[in-house]
C-alpha cells in the first residue's frame, strides 16, 4: 500500500513524464557529466554476469546502457507507471535478461538477497532514506554493492534556486545532508563518496560538450582538488555513493 508521500511522488513523476519537453534545469547537468562517467565506469567493471536492480529506473536510459555490460539479469522498477510504459518502448522487454516493473522502492516485491548491485540516479532524495536503505540492504546479496548519484542540499545558491523554482521538483524531495551520510554509514560498509559540480557548475556557460572540452577537464580536476577540503564539499552539487552490504 502506498503512503501519501508515495502517491504524491507517483503523481509528480507521471505528470513529468507526460510532458513533451524536459525541465529547464536539464541544461545544467553537463556540469556533473563526470559523475555519470564514473557511475558507468563502475557498472562497466562490475556488471558482467551480475543480477542488477535499477532502483527508480525512470524511462530506462541507464538500464539500456547497462545492458551493454552483459549482466546476468537486470530489473528496473519505478513507482511511475507512465515511466515504465515509456521504458518498455525504449528497451526490448522481450529480452529475457530484462524485467521492467511498477513497484514501490520503499517496499519492493523481491526476495531477500536477490541482487549483486542496486543502482540509481537521483532517487534516494525522493524517498524515506531510512526505509529505502533498509530495503536495499534486504534485497542485496551479502557483499552486494549499492551505487547512487544524488544531489546535495548544502550549497546555499543551489538551495535558493530550488526555492525559486518549486514547480520543477516534487514537494517531498530532500537533497542529501551530512546526517544522511551518517545514516548510510550506519547501515553499510566500504563506503566511498565522491563529490561533483562546484567550479564546473559556476563556469558551465563557457564550455560546450564536457567530454571534448579542455576547460571542463581543468575545472573538474580543480574541483576534485578543492573537494579534499571539507568546506568545499558543502558547495558541491552532487555525490556518487558506493557502498557494500556487510
Name the predicted role of every residue range.
Residues 1-47, 50-58:
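Conserved class I S-adenosyl-L-methionine
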Residues 59-107:
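Class I SAM-dependent methyltransferase SAM/SAH-binding core
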Residues 119:
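A conserved beta-strand element that flanks and buttresses the S-adenosyl-L-methionine
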Residues 127-135:
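A short, conserved alpha-helix within the catalytic core of class I
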Residues 144-151:
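Conserved beta-strand signature within the Rossmann-like core of class I S-adenosyl-L-methionine
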Residues 173-191:
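Short alpha-helix
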Residues 195-246:
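A C-terminal cap/extension of S-adenosyl-L-methionine-dependent methyltransferases
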Amino acid at each position: 500500500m502506498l503512503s501519501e508521500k508515495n502517491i504524491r511522488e507517483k503523481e509528480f513523476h507521471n505528470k513529468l513524464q507526460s510532458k513533451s519537453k524536459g525541465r529547464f534545469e536539464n541544461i545544467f547537468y553537463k556540469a556533473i557529466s563526470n559523475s555519470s562517467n564514473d557511475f558507468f565506469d563502475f557498472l562497466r567493471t562490475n556488471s558482467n554476469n551480475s543480477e542488477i536492480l535499477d532502483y527508480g529506473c525512470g524511462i530506462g536510459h541507464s538500464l539500456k546502457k547497462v545492458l551493454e555490460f552483459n549482466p546476468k539479469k537486470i530489473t528496473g522498477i519505478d513507482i511511475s507507471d507512465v515511466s515504465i510504459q515509456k521504458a518498455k518502448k525504449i528497451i526490448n522487454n522481450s529480452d529475457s535478461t530484462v524485467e521492467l516493473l511498477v513497484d514501490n522502492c520503499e517496499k519492493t516485491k523481491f526476495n531477500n538477497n536477490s541482487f549483486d548491485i542496486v543502482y540509481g540516479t537521483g532517487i534516494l532524495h525522493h524517498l524515506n532514506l531510512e526505509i529505502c536503505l533498509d530495503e536495499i540492504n534486504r534485497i542485496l546479496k551479502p557483499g552486494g554493492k549499492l551505487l547512487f548519484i544524488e544531489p546535495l542540499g548544502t550549497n546555499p545558491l543551489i538551495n535558493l534556486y530550488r526555492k525559486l523554482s518549486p514547480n520543477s521538483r516534487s514537494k517531498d524531495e530532500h537533497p542529501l545532508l551530512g546526517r544522511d551520510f551518517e545514516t548510510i554509514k550506519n547501515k553499510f560498509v566500504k563506503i566511498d563518496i565522491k563529490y561533483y559540480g562546484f567550479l564546473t557548475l559556476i563556469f558551465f556557460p563557457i564550455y560546450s560538450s564536457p567530454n571534448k572540452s579542455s576547460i571542463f577537464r581543468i575545472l573538474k580536476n580543480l574541483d576534485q582538488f578543492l573537494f579534499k577540503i571539507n568546506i568545499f564539499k558543502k558547495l558541491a552539487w552532487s555525490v556518487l555513493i558506493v557502498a557494500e552490504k556487510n
